[in-house]
UniProtKB/Swiss-Prot annotation:
Family: Belongs to the OXA1/ALB3/YidC family. Type 1 subfamily.
Keywords: Cell inner membrane, Cell membrane, Chaperone, Membrane, Protein transport, Transmembrane, Transmembrane helix, Transport
Any Gene Ontology CC annotation: plasma membrane
Protein name, per record: Membrane protein insertase YidC
Length: 583
């Protein structure tokens, strides 16, 4: 490896480590707002004891509906088991059937199981703030349990009579094979009663954490919205601070997410804006979020009939993108102009294609590494041969540097000529590595946040989306972490071996330093990376070592450059110095 190659690789390694430490953007707190306290309670009883009716001055015309008896209805399809409540016409539980939590237990997407996650919120002209979770609806559907499969559909309708000619209807629509739930809102005779001529549809409580590493998952948890072609994010990461974001405009969706799952509200018609807020409780990694759509209501409307969809499920790129509202934008693949295209148009499509005939994602990663090596083979082959030629030129170049040591301009001119005649590029050694950086960073984002690798094992790695830790220290070592991962160690060995057999233009001392420093830096960087990323880089290095062995074995003296250095033979130089220049 020449000096430029080593310098380039060292800079890349430093960038990777610094990027790892500072990749999370700073979260700016806003003014304090109401704390949203969350609980995880799954209601299992069909009927809940009645409660007393609150005072009329809290609910106005809704006072008669603020007390009653709660009735639960369970709906099960191929993908989840949902529990609906007549108190609030809300969703109290949604347990995913094909995805478990970090302890391999059933995972409930609803964090606010006591009050429910979904509701309407509005202010009456009397100044009463109404959250429909405080109201008792009648269930037009008399079932207590319904199971549907495949393309079967099922609707649950809740009705609330408020006053003569005034009513609220909320209808849930389920399909047997879909994470999407239809959510219809019908307001009769309310247009003139709503202050500000609007109401909100909200998801309250965020999404529960699903993984064992809660601090890591907290980095992915947020509330988000997509409106006007722009992504809005709210990340409540700091304790004792409230965060709030409110914007007007037509939104395609609002959502809350954790690392691998999302709950999204998607309007079928126009929305008037969005409202997001969040807070992290003291001493708790969990971040509670609220995401709401603002819906305008014409003051002259007798009946308001608004339709929405809920997407309640995994952050699976293909499924999320199939919603056709840009919901895939909530998935973090890094820089939109650099790493995201690699993730969306190369990594995920290739993985999805290979998963059609290879079920093990460890094998898919190995095949992918081989394919990338195959694609970059011409470039890396040319680069390696160029480095080998550079190594062969070193004795002559040192002689040239000695001759023109007092004339830097002439030296650079001669070096350029010689490089051109020899067909070498002095910076070509690090070019393949530099070109792979966007792909490597994109793979980091994909492996860290996409559900495709989650809980898929390979060899000793139990989960390819997290480090392949075999031993935990119980404390953190700065820059290294709190555990020992195997793939990074093996990868560092292959980096060392690759440098060992690669031609170099460095001095022995320089070579000794880089032979150990660069593998060590890569070990530090990859120890906390997903196991899938370490496996990819390990296999890519193994293929690179095999390629280097092949080049070293097949390259002969005839392949080495023959250039005219423009230097006189040593004897002629001595005669010229003794006799002086000819006149």
């Amino acid at each position: 490896m020449d000096r430029n190659s080593v310098t380039g690789l060292a800079i890349i390694a430093v960038i990777m480590i610094v990027w790892l430490q500072f990749m999370s953007p700073e979260k700016k707190p806003l003014l304090p707002s109401k704390t949203v306290k969350t609980e995880t309670v799954v209601q299992s009883d069909v009927q809940v004891p009645a409660v007393s009716i609150p005072a009329a001055d809290n609910f106005g015309v809704f006072a008669s509906s603020s007390g009653g008896q709660e009735k639960l209805l369970k709906v099960e399809n191929d993908l989840f088991r949902a529990t609906l409540s007549s108190k609030g016409a809300t969703l109290k539980s949604l347990v995913l059937k094909k995805h478990l939590d970090g302890n391999r237990l059933p995972f409930d997407l609803v964090s606010n199981g006591k009050n429910g996650a979904l509701s309407l919120l509005f202010l009456t002209r009397e100044g009463k703030k109404i959250d429909t979770r405080d109201l008792y609806f009648s269930n037009v559907t008399l079932d207590t349990l319904r199971t549907i499969k495949g393309k079967e559909s099922y609707a649950v309708r809740y009705h609330l009579d408020v006053a003569p000619q005034q009513a609220i209807d909320i209808i849930f629509g389920f399909t047997g094979d879909s994470y999407k739930v239809d959510y219809d809102v019908k307001l009769t005779g309310f247009a003139s009663e709503l202050a500000g001529n609007e109401y909100q549809v909200q998801w309250d409580g965020g999404v529960p954490f699903s993984e064992k590493n809660r601090p890591d998952e907290a980095q992915s948890a947020l509330a988000s919205a997509y409106l006007g072609g722009s992504l809005v994010k709210l990340d409540a990461s700091k304790e004792k601070q409230s965060y709030r974001e409110e914007q007007s405009g037509e939104a395609q969706w609002v959502a809350v997410r954790n690392k691998y799952f999302v709950a999204a509200l998607i309007p079928h018609g126009k929305s008037a804006g969005i409202y997001l807020d969040g807070k992290r409780e003291t001493g708790n990694d969990f971040e509670s979020y609220l995401a709401a759509l603002k819906i305008a209501v014409p003051s002259t409307a007798g009946v308001v009939d608004d339709k929405f969809s809920l997407y309640l499920g995994p952050l699976d790129y293909n499924i999320v993108k199939a919603q056709k509202v840009g919901l895939e934008k909530i998935m973090d693949f890094g820089w939109d102009w650099l790493t995201r295209p690699f993730a969306e148009f190369i990594i995920l499509p290739v993985f999805s294609w290979m998963n059609g005939f290879v079920s093990n994602y460890g094998l898919i990663i190995i095949i992918f590494a081989f394919l990338i090596k195959l694609v970059t083979y011409p470039l890396s082959m040319a680069s390696t041969k160029s480095m080998k030629k550079m190594s062969a030129l070193q004795p002559a170049l040192k002689e040239l540097q000695e001759k023109y040591k007092d004339n830097p301009a002439k030296l650079q001119s001669e070096l350029g000529r010689i490089y051109k005649e020899a067909g070498v590029n002095p910076i070509g050694g690090c070019l393949p590595v530099v070109l792979q950086m966007p792909l490597l960073f994109a793979m980091f984002y994909v492996f860290r946040s996409s559900i495709e690798l989650r809980q898929h094992s390979f060899l000793w790695a139990k989960d390819l989306s997290v480090p392949d830790s075999i031993f935990d220290f119980g404390f953190a070592i700065p820059m290294y972490g709190s555990h020992i991962a195997v793939f990074p160690i093996l990868m560092a060995v292959t980096v060392y071996l690759q440098q060992k057999i690669t031609p170099t233009t460095q001095s022995n001392e320089q070579m000794k330093v880089m032979m150990y420093m660069f593998p060590a830096m890569m070990l530090l960087f990859f120890n906390n990376m997903p196991a899938g990323l370490g496996l990819y880089y390990l296999m890519f290095n193994i293929f690179s070592v095999a390629q280097q062995f092949y080049i070293n074995k097949t390259t002969t003296a005839a392949d080495m450059p023959q250039v005219n250095l423009g230097l006189a033979p040593a004897g002629a130089q001595r005669k010229q110095k003794k006799g002086g220049a000819k006149k």
